[in-house]
Amino acid sequence: MLKPSDKWSWYFSDSEGYLMLNLGDDMLFRTNLSRNLLVDCAFIENPFTVDDASDFQLYKEHIACLPLSEPRKAELALYCVAAKRFHKPVQPKSWFFDVQGTGYTPQQGQLISLRNSLNSGIFIALEVGENATLCAYSDLVSFALNGSKTLEFGQVIKVMHDRMSDVNTLLYTPQMAMVS
């Protein structure tokens, strides 16, 4: 099991073209964040902070119920930490998703459901704003946004709250029998 360490550090690899996490002991983790997705501070070495470790733990706890192997859960949690800290600010792309209601605002780390006419998927809330949230896709099967665009495991998208529903509501809604 992967345990955060104060010896870890983030850096951008010109040869890989991606943000990397040095885990020590000659172990490296390549994130899914390429140069064009990163804020300026990602291009210098940055320590893995206490906040990063706290976020990693939060994401690990929330994704524990997902049908992923332990290495994939750790990978997703690290993708989430990297995106929350180093992803450039983006505008919502809510038009890819169906409206699911109003009044719902997720909390950081919470699993949410997004759907469209092609599929539905489970995402994890990374950065919650007043009206929209940056979230990461959590399935190994591609999520079709439209006929030509997809989201892959760990990729992020910002979406308005009216497109989201709570995964726990979907998974754990008790069945009720009508009796007379």
Curated annotation (Swiss-Prot):
Keyword line: Cell cycle, Cell division, Cytoplasm, Septation
Single GO cellular component term: cytoplasm
Disulfide bridge map: none
GO terms classed as biological process: division septum assembly; FtsZ-dependent cytokinesis
Predominant localisation class: cytoplasm
Keyword match tRNA processing: no
Record's subcellular location: Cytoplasm
Record's function text: Contributes to the efficiency of the cell division process by stabilizing the polymeric form of the cell division protein FtsZ. Acts by promoting interactions between FtsZ protofilaments and suppressing the GTPase activity of FtsZ.
Family assignment from sequence similarity: Belongs to the ZapC family.
The protein's assembly and partners: Interacts directly with FtsZ.
Name of this protein: Cell division protein ZapC
Organism: Vibrio cholerae serotype O1 (strain ATCC 39315 / El Tor Inaba N16961)
Chain's gene name: zapC
